[in-house]
Curated annotation (Swiss-Prot):
NCBIfam families: rpoC_TIGR
Keyword vocabulary terms for this entry: DNA-directed RNA polymerase, Magnesium, Metal-binding, Nucleotidyltransferase, Transcription, Transferase, Zinc
UniProt GO cellular component terms: DNA-directed RNA polymerase complex
Cofactor: Mg(2+); Zn(2+)
GO biological process terms, semicolon-separated: DNA-templated transcription
Species annotation: Rhodopseudomonas palustris (strain ATCC BAA-98 / CGA009)
The protein's name in its UniProt record: DNA-directed RNA polymerase subunit beta'
Record-annotated disulphide pairs: none
Ligand binding (Zn(2+) 2): C812, C886, C893, C896
Gene: rpoC
Enzyme Commission code: 2.7.7.6
Transmembrane segments: none
Length: 1402
C-alpha cells in the first residue's frame, strides 16, 4: 500500500499525504485567506470568446490557478514532464498537473469591508450577541441608514448610540467636527468588534449573573457569556466576522462546460463571483475619482449585497436569480439539503460495477445462491475477464480482450465461470430499510434477463415477484469479498436483528404445502397400520394403501441425550414422517417437534430450535429442504378454493336482528333523555362491533368444523380455512369480510360510522354500503402515500441520533441496572418476563424465591434455559444491565447490551448497535404504514370495561376503599385501589388497577376461579361519587351562568350541564360545586378533614337534584369521555415520533412532584390554584395553577404520592424524568413505544429502544456551577461535565452539579459532539456557524463523520483497524519519549561529545 502511495506521489507531487485524527473548524482570518490564495482576481472575465483560453487575472486565470492541460503552459512554449515546475516567462503559468485547478484558490481584495452574512443573519446573530445590539440596529448601520458613535469624547452622546444622517450633521455642528467619532457601514461594526475587551466583558457578565434574580435576564446573560467565552478560548478574533478579503474557490469546482452549439453552461458561483468583482472594481474606481459620498455609499451597499448573495443567496433581501428566473445556488446552498455536498456526495456515493434487473423466483437455488443473467455477469466482471484473458495468453492488449468479449467467444464464457466461482455479489432491494436489505449471494449463471432470488430471503428484502427490481453490486477488493462472504452472506442472516426470531421463514405456498403435509384425519383407509421404515411407508403411499393424512404407527430411530440409539413407536401420519426425514438428527430435537399441525408459527419455532441446537449450517440445509418439501406438496395437494368454500353462518341474521333491536333500544333511551348523544353513539358502535365479532366466531366455527363423509372418514378441511389457519395467506379479519359481515367502517376523519355494513363480499354490498366502504379504502391508500415519507424521516432521525453508539468494550463494570417485570395489560400478560430478559445480562444474582438458591449469577448472560428456570421458579422481577445505565464514556459495553440478536451470541466488539437499533425501530414504521389499507378501514375497537380473573387464587386488595351505594352495589371510592390475585404460596399472579367508580364484585380474602368477574365499569363516562350520606346542596350552580338546561332537540328531554362559567356575565368568580349537607343543613365533613364539597368541571352532567338523599358511592355527576376512535398505526407513527422527539403532549398530565396533602388555594384569573403540603417537613410546598376546564379528581385533603397524577392526561416525559428518574422514564418510553408496535403485531426488542433513549439523555443541565467554568442553566455533554468536574476536584475546587435532561432525537442529533454529523443532518448553516465561532474540534468518533472524511468507519471490521492504530500511536509515543530522554541525558553528561546517532524516527 505504502509503495503504491509513493508511486502515485511521484506523479502527483501537489498533495501531501494527510494523516489526521481530528478536524477543527474556525473563522478564517484575512491573513489566512491570503495564505491560501495563489493570486488576486481583478477582472470578472472568464474565458476569451475566440480562443477559449482563460483571461489573465480573470475568474479562470491560468497564472493563478494553474495550467489547463497537464504539463503545458498556456502559450505552449513549455510542454512535457521535463519542464515540471518551471514558470513560463511569456504567460507566467507554472508547468504542472492540471489537477491543481481543483486545489488552488484565489482571492478578491475588497475596497470596503463587508459583514459575513452567516455571523450576522444566522440566528442568534453572533455579531449582535457580542456587541449586545439588536439585528435591526446592526442592519441599519451595515446598510448605511444610521451612524454609530464609537468614541463619544466629551460630548453628551453615548457609546454605540445610533444617529441618523440629520442627527449626525447636527451633532457635528453642535460639538465640532473632531469632538467625537461616529462611523457607518461595515467599517463601523469592524471597529466596534476590534475594540471589544473580552476579558472585561466576561467578568462583567459573570458579576451581573450573580446579582440578577430574574430567570429571563439570567438566560440572556448566559447566552451572551457563552459567545464571549467562545471567542476567548477558540482563538478567533471578533473582527474576523467582517470580511476584507473574499476567497475564491478553485475553478474546476465551479466549471464552465462547453455545450454543443457553441454555448456554455456555467456554475452559478461564477455569476455570483462576477457580480462581486464588478461591484468591487466600480467601487475602487469611484473612490479614486472621489465621487460624492452618497454614490460611494450606494456602491458599498451593493457590494455588501453581492457578497451576501455569494455566501448565502436569499438569506437577506430578495433572491438573486439567473437568466431563467431560477435562484442562483450560493456557497451555502452547495452544502445544504438532500442535494447538497454532504448528503449527495459525501454520505451517498454512487458506485461502479453495478446493475439492476427485475427479479423472478428461483426455487431450485440453494439459500446462498442467486441467479445472475449471463449478459449482466459479463458486463459486471469485465475487468476480471480481461485480466484472466491476458493471464491465459488469449489476448495481449486490452483492445483485443475487449473484442473477444464483445464477440462472446466460447472461451470467454469459460473464463466468466472461473471468475464468478467463489466471488460473491451483493443484492439490494430499495427501499433498504434495515441491514437485511443488502445481502451477499454466490452468483449462478442463468439464461434470460431476470435475476433469480431464493424464495426464503424474500421476507428479509420485503420483495415479491410482481415486478420488483433489484440491484447487483460487485465487491472488488479482497477485503470487500471477505466481508461479503463472512458477514453479509444470506446464510449468516437467519435471525432478525430487531427481535432475534428467524427471518428465513417459509411463507405462502411453502407453508401451505407443509400444513397440508402435517394434517391428520380420522377414519382414512389404512388407519392404525404399523410401518418399520421409510421404504415400506413410501410403498404403501404410492400404492394408495394409505393416505398422507392417515393415522399410522411408525418405528422412529433416534439418538437420545446419552448418545444411545433408541426406537420409539410413534402415532403419527405418513406426511409427518416425510417431514421428519428432513429434520436434523439431534438428541435435542425429538420427533414431537414436528408431530403436530405445522402452521407458519410452528415452522418458525422449529427453525429457531434447529438454529439453537444444531448451529447455522444445519439450519440452512434444513431450510432449503423444508422449502423444497413445501413447494412439492403444495403442488401435489392441488389446493384451490371456490365460492362455496366461503360459508356464511346460519345464525348471522339472528345476531343481526337482535343487535338491531338493541340499537333501537339505545336510540329510545336517548330519545327519553336517559343517555347523551355521545353515550348513545358509543353504545351503538359497541353493540355492532360485538355483533361482528360474534358472526365472525360463528363463521370460523362453521368453516373450521370437521365434516364426516358417509363412510365415516373425515373430509378435507375447508381450503380457505387451511390458507388462513396455516398463515399462508389471508387472516380471520379478511375471512370475516368475505363470509361474515364487513362490520363498521371509519370516516376519513377517523370516526366510526354508526351504521355497519351488514353484507359480506359473498352476498354483495348494496349501493349505500358500497359507498360507505369506499371511505375506508380511499383513506387507506391516501394515508399510505403520506406515511411512507414520515416513516422514512423518522428512520433518518433515529439513525442520526444513534450512529455513534458502538460496542467499544466488553464490560464497563457498573453495578447499575434496570428492573424488569412482565407487562400486564388489563389482566393479560402482554409481554412475559422471560421474553423481556432473554439475552440480557443479570444485574444482580437471580434467586429462587422459595429456596433462595442462585439461578443466574450476576453478570451472566441469560440464555433460554436460564429464562425457563426463572419462569419455573416464579420470579416476578429481575434486575438486568441496560444500555441506559452503561457507564462507558464512548459507546456501550458488551455486558450492558447483552446478546447480539442477529447471531444469538454475546455481542461482538465494534458492533454498530445504534444503527441497528434505529433500523429495527424505523423499518416496521414503513412496513406498517404500507400495510394499513389491507383490511380496508374496517373499524376495530378495543374498549375494556370488565376485569375477569385469569387465574384461580385469593383476592388481596391494596388501598381498599369500597362503599355500598343506594342500589346495593359495591363501588370503588379511590383511584389507587389495586386488586391482586395471589397463589396459595403468596406469589402475585396478576394485579389490576381498579377504576374510580367501578362496581367491585369481590372483597379481601375471597377465593376466585378463572374467568370470574372481578369488577366492571362504564368505559364512556367518568363519575363523581359522594363519600358520605346526606342531602344534596348546590353551590354557585346558577342557571345560565354556570349551568344550563339543554333540551336535546331530538328527544325533547332536558338535562343539566355545567357550562363554562368564565365566559358568562358575572360568572368569573363562581366555583360551581355540589355539597352534601347533614340533618342540621350544615356541610358535612369528610373522614380526612375536608368539607364534602365536590367541584365540577365544564361539561359535567348532573345526575342529582337539590334536596335529594344520597348514600356513599352514589353518582353525583358524570363526565363523558371521548368517543371511541379506531387505533391503527396512523395514530401509531405520529405517536412514536412524538415520544422520540420528547414533545410535551397537548393536554399534558400534571404530576405531583412530592408526596403530600392536597390543598386548594384562592383561584387566580381563570386558573384553579392547588398546592401540595409535603409530608416530609424538609421539603418545600409545591403550587400548581390548573386551567378551570380541566377536571381535577382530587378533593381538598387527599393524600398523593410522588408521581401521582393530579390532572389526567398523557404525562410529559420531561416531568417523569425530573420527578421519578431515568429508570421510570425509560420504562415509560419503552412501554409506550412498544404498545404502538404491539398493536400491529410487530416484535421489537426493548434494548433497541433503550439505546435510542440513552442517546436522548446525553446532556446535563447545570443547576449549580460550583467553581468551574460552566454556566448554570446551560446544557453540557455528560462526558464534558464529568471531565470538568474531575479537573475541579483535582484542583480542590467545588464541582458543578446538574440534572439529566431529555432531548428529542432531532435536537440530540444537532447537539452531538461532532459538527460534521450535525451539519450533514439538518440546519447546516446554523451548525457550521456555531462550530466555527466556538472553534470546535471534531474527534471523528462516530460513523458519519468518518464516512464524510473518507475513512473506514470505527465499527465492525473498521473497529479493529482503529484499535490497531491506537496501539501503534501509543508505541510511537513511547519510542519518541525515550529518544527525547536520551537526547536530554547525553549532552548533560558529556558536553564535548558529539550527539548520539539514533535510528530515524518512525
Amino acid at each position: 500500500m505504502a509503495m503504491n502511495q509513493e508511486i502515485m506521489n511521484l506523479f502527483n507531487p501537489t498533495t501531501p499525504a494527510q494523516v489526521f485524527d481530528q478536524i477543527r473548524i474556525s473563522i478564517a482570518s484575512p491573513e489566512k485567506i491570503l495564505s491560501w490564495s495563489y493570486g488576486e482576481i481583478k477582472k470578472p472575465e472568464t474565458i476569451n470568446y475566440r480562443t477559449f483560453k482563460p483571461e489573465r487575472d480573470g475568474l479562470f486565470c491560468a497564472r493563478i490557478f494553474g495550467p489547463i492541460k497537464d504539463y503545458e503552459c498556456l502559450c505552449g512554449k513549455y510542454k512535457r514532464m521535463k519542464y515540471k515546475g518551471i514558470i513560463c516567462e511569456k504567460c507566467s503559468v507554472e508547468v504542472t498537473l492540471s489537477r491543481v485547478r481543483r486545489e488552488r484558490m484565489g482571492h478578491i481584495e475588497l475596497a470596503a469591508p463587508v459583514a459575513h452574512i452567516w455571523f450576522l443573519k444566522s440566528l442568534p446573530s453572533r455579531i449582535g450577541q457580542l456587541l449586545d445590539m439588536t439585528l435591526k440596529d446592526l442592519e441599519r448601520i451595515l446598510y448605511f441608514e444610521y451612524y454609530v458613535v464609537l468614541e463619544p469624547g466629551l460630548t453628551d452622546l453615548k457609546e454605540r448610540q445610533l444617529l441618523s444622517e440629520e442627527e449626525y450633521l447636527r451633532a457635528q455642528d453642535q460639538y465640532g467636527q473632531d469632538s467625537f467619532t461616529a462611523m457607518i457601514g461595515a467599517e463601523a461594526i469592524r471597529e466596534l468588534l476590534k475594540g471589544l475587551e473580552l476579558e472585561k466583558i466576561d467578568a462583567q457578565l459573570r458579576a451581573e449573573m450573580a446579582e440578577t434574580d430574574s430567570d429571563i435576564k439570567h438566560k440572556k446573560l448566559a447566552k451572551r457569556l457563552k459567545i464571549v467565552e467562545a471567542f476567548r478560548y477558540s482563538g478567533n478574533k471578533p473582527e474576523w466576522m467582517i470580511l476584507t478579503v473574499v476567497p475564491v474557490i478553485p475553478p474546476d469546482l465551479r466549471p464552465l462546460v462547453p455545450l454543443d452549439g457553441g454555448r456554455f453552461a456555467t456554475s452559478d458561483l461564477n455569476d455570483l463571483y462576477r457580480r462581486v468583482i464588478n461591484r468591487n472594481n466600480r467601487l475602487k474606481r469611484l473612490m479614486e475619482l472621489r465621487a460624492p459620498d452618497i454614490i460611494i455609499r450606494n456602491e458599498k451597499r451593493m457590494l455588501q449585497e453581492a457578497v451576501d448573495a455569494l455566501f448565502d443567496n436569499g438569506r437577506r433581501g430578495r433572491v438573486i436569480t439567473g437568466a431563467n428566473k431560477r435562484p442562483l445556488k450560493s456557497l451555502a446552498d452547495m452544502l445544504k439539503g438532500k442535494q447538497g455536498r454532504f448528503r449527495q456526495n459525501l454520505l451517498g456515493k454512487r458506485v461502479d460495477y453495478s446493475g439492476r434487473s427485475v427479479i423472478v423466483v428461483g426455487p431450485e437455488l440453494k439459500l446462498h445462491q442467486c441467479g445472475l443473467p449471463k449478459k449482466m455477469a459479463l458486463e459486471l466482471f469485465k475487468p476480471f475477464i480481461y485480466s484472466r484473458l491476458d493471464a491465459k495468453g488469449l489476448s495481449t492488449t486490452v483492445k483485443q480482450a475487449k473484442k473477444l468479449v464483445e464477440k462472446e467467444r466460447p472461451e470467454v464464457w469459460d473464463i466468466l465461470d472461473e471468475v464468478i466461482r467463489e466471488h460473491p455479489v451483493l443484492l439490494n432491494r430499495a427501499p433498504t430499510l434495515h441491514r437485511l436489505g443488502i445481502q451477499a449471494f454466490e452468483p449462478v449463471l442463468i439464461e434470460g434477463k431476470a435475476i433469480q432470488l431464493h424464495p426464503l430471503v424474500c421476507s428479509a428484502f420485503n420483495a415479491d415477484f410482481d415486478g420488483d427490481q433489484m440491484a447487483v453490486h460487485v465487491p472488488l477488493s479482497l477485503e470487500a469479498q471477505l466481508e461479503a462472504r463472512v458477514l453479509m452472506m444470506s446464510t449468516n442472516n437467519i435471525l432478525h436483528p430487531a427481535n432475534g426470531q428467524p427471518i428465513i421463514v417459509p411463507s405462502q405456498d411453502i407453508v401451505l404445502g407443509l400444513y397440508y403435509l402435517s394434517i391428520m384425519r380420522e377414519g382414512l383407509p389404512g388407519e392404525g397400520k404399523v410401518f418399520a421404515d421409510l421404504a415400506e411407508l413410501e410403498h404403501a403411499l404410492y400404492s394408495k394403501v394409505i393416505h398422507l393424512h392417515t393415522k399410522i404407527k411408525y418405528r422412529w430411530h433416534w439418538v437420545n441425550e446419552e448418545g444411545e440409539n433408541t426406537v420409539r413407536l410413534l402415532e403419527t401420519t405418513a406426511g409427518r414422517i416425510l417431514l421428519g426425514q428432513v429434520l436434523p438428527k439431534s438428541p435435542k430435537l425429538p420427533f414431537d417437534v414436528i408431530n403436530k399441525l405445522m402452521t407458519k408459527r410452528e415452522i418458525s419455532g422449529v427453525i429457531d430450535q434447529v438454529y439453537r441446537h444444531c448451529g447455522q449450517k444445519e439450519t440452512v440445509i434444513f431450510c432449503d429442504r423444508i422449502m423444497a418439501l413445501g413447494f412439492f406438496n403444495a403442488f401435489k395437494a392441488g389446493i384451490s378454493f371456490g365460492k362455496d368454500d366461503m360459508v356464511v353462518p346460519g345464525s348471522k341474521w339472528k345476531i343481526v336482528d337482535s343487535t338491531r333491536t338493541l340499537a333501537k333500544d339505545f336510540e329510545q333511551q336517548y330519545n327519553d333523555g336517559l343517555i347523551t348523544h355521545g353515550e348513545k353513539y358509543n353504545k351503538v358502535v359497541d353493540a355492532w362491533s360485538k355483533a361482528t365479532e360474534e358472526i365472525a366466531k360463528e363463521m370460523m366455527k362453521e368453516i373450521s368444523a370437521v365434516r364426516k363423509a358417509p363412510d365415516g372418514s373425515e373430509q378435507q378441511v375447508n381450503s380457505i380455512y387451511m390458507m388462513a389457519h396455516s398463515g399462508a395467506r389471508g387472516s380471520p379479519a379478511q375471512m370475516r369480510q368475505l363470509a361474515g359481515m364487513r362490520g363498521l367502517m371509519a370516516k376519513p376523519s377517523g370516526e366510526i360510522i354508526e351504521t355497519p355494513i351488514i353484507s359480506n363480499f359473498k352476498e354483495g354490498l348494496s349501493v349505500l354500503e358500497y359507498f360507505n366502504s369506499t371511505h375506508g379504502a380511499r383513506k387507506g391508500l391516501a394515508d399510505t402515500a403520506l406515511k411512507t415519507a414520515n416513516s422514512g424521516y423518522l428512520t433518518r432521525r433515529l439513525v442520526d441520533v444513534a450512529q455513534d453508539c458502538i460496542i467499544t468494550q466488553a464490560d464497563c463494570g457498573t453495578s447499575l441496572g434496570i428492573k424488569m417485570r412482565a407487562i400486564v395489560d388489563a389482566g393479560t400478560v402482554v409481554a412475559s418476563l422471560g421474553s423481556r430478559i432473554l439475552g440480557r445480562t443479570a444485574g444482580e444474582d437471580v434467586r429462587d424465591p422459595a429456596t433462595n438458591e442462585i439461578i443466574v449469577k450476576r453478570g451472566d448472560l441469560m440464555e433460554e434455559r436460564d429464562v425457563e428456570a426463572i419462569h419455573q421458579a416464579g420470579v416476578q422481577e429481575v434486575k438486568i444491565r441496560s444500555a441506559l445505565t452503561c457507564e462507558l464514556v464512548n459507546g456501550i459495553c458488551g455486558k450492558c447490551y447483552g446478546r447480539d440478536l442477529a447471531r444469538g451470541t454475546p455481542v461482538n466488539h465494534g458492533e454498530a448497535v445504534g444503527v441497528i437499533a434505529a433500523q429495527s425501530i424505523g423499518e416496521p414504521g414503513t412496513q406498517l404504514t404500507m400495510r394499513t389499507f389491507h383490511i380496508g378501514g374496517a373499524a376495530q375497537i378495543n374498549e375494556q370495561s370488565v376485569i375477569e380473573s385469569n387465574f384461580d387464587g385469593k383476592i388481596v386488595i391494596k388501598n381498599r376503599a369500597i362503599a355500598r351505594n343506594g342500589e346495593g352495589h359495591n363501588v370503588a371510592m379511590v383511584r389507587n385501589m389495586v386488586i391482586a390475585i395471589v397463589d396459595p404460596d403468596g406469589t402475585e399472579r396478576a394485579t389490576h388497577r381498579i377504576q374510580y367508580g367501578a362496581r367491585v364484585h369481590v372483597d379481601e380474602g375471597d377465593m376466585v376461579k378463572r374467568g370470574q368477574r372481578i369488577a366492571e365499569w362504564d368505559p364512556y363516562t367518568r363519575p363523581i361519587l359522594t363519600e358520605v350520606e346526606g342531602e344534596i346542596g348546590f353551590e354557585d350552580l346558577i342557571e345560565d351562568q354556570s349551568i344550563s338546561e339543554t333540551l336535546d332537540e331530538s328527544t325533547g328531554i332536558a338535562k343539566r350541564i355545567v357550562i363554562d362559567w368564565r365566559s358568562t356575565r358575572g360568572g368569573a368568580d363562581l366555583r360551581p360545586a355540589i355539597v352534601i349537607k347533614g340533618k342540621d343543613g350544615k356541610v358535612l365533613k369528610l373522614a380526612r378533614g375536608g368539607d364534602a364539597r365536590y367541584m365540577l368541571s365544564v361539561d359535567a352532567i348532573l345526575s342529582v337534584d337539590v334536596g335529594a338523599q344520597v348514600k356513599p358511592g352514589d353518582i353525583l355527576a358524570r363526565i363523558s369521555t371521548e368517543s371511541a376512535k379506531t387505533r391503527d398505526i396512523t395514530g401509531g407513527l405520529p405517536r412514536v415520533a412524538e415520544l422520540f422527539e420528547a414533545r410535551r403532549p397537548k393536554d399534558a398530565a400534571i404530576i405531583a412532584e412530592i408526596a403530600g396533602t392536597i390543598r386548594f388555594g384562592r383561584d387566580y384569573k381563570n386558573k384553579r390554584r392547588l398546592s401540595i403540603e409535603p409530608l416530609d417537613k424538609n421539603e418545600e410546598a409545591r403550587e400548581y395553577l390548573i386551567p378551570k376546564g380541566k377536571h381535577i379528581h382530587l378533593q381538598d385533603g387527599d393524600v398523593v404520592e410522588k408521581g401521582d397524577f393530579i390532572v389526567e392526561g398523557n404525562p410529559a416525559p420531561h416531568d417523569i424524568l425530573a420527578i421519578k428518574g431515568i429508570e421510570e422514564l425509560a420504562a415509560y418510553l419503552v412501554n409506550e413505544i412498544q404498545e404502538v408496535y404491539r398493536l400491529q403485531g410487530v416484535l421489537i426488542n426493548d434494548k433497541h429502544i433503550e439505546v435510542i433513549v440513552r442517546q436522548m439523555l446525553q446532556k446535563i443541565e447545570i443547576t449549580d456551577q460550583g467553581d468551574t467554568d460552566m454556566i448554570s442553566g446551560e446544557q453540557v455533554d455528560k462526558i464534558e461535565f464529568n471531565a470538568l468536574n474531575a479537573k475541579a476536584v483535582e484542583e480542590g475546587k467545588k464541582p458543578a452539579t446538574g440534572n439529566p435532561v431529555l432531548l428529542g432525537i432531532t435536537k440530540a442529533s444537532l447537539q452531538t459532539r461532532s459538527f460534521f454529523s450535525a451539519a450533514s443532518f439538518q440546519e447546516t448553516t446554523r451548525v457550521l456557524t456555531e462550530a466555527a465561532v466556538n472553534g470546535k474540534v471534531d474527534p471523528l468518533e462516530g460513523l458519519k463523520e468518518n464516512v464524510i472524511v473518507g475513512r473506514l468507519i470505527p465499527a465492525g471490521t473498521g473497529a479493529s483497524m482503529a484499535k490497531i492504530r491506537e496501539v501503534a500511536v501509543k508505541r510511537d509515543r513511547l519510542i519518541l519519549d525515550e529518544r527525547e530522554k536520551q537526547a536530554a541525558i547525553v549532552p548533560a553528561a558529556a558536553p564535548e561529545a558529539e550527539p548520539l546517532s539514533l535510528p530515524p524516527a518512525e
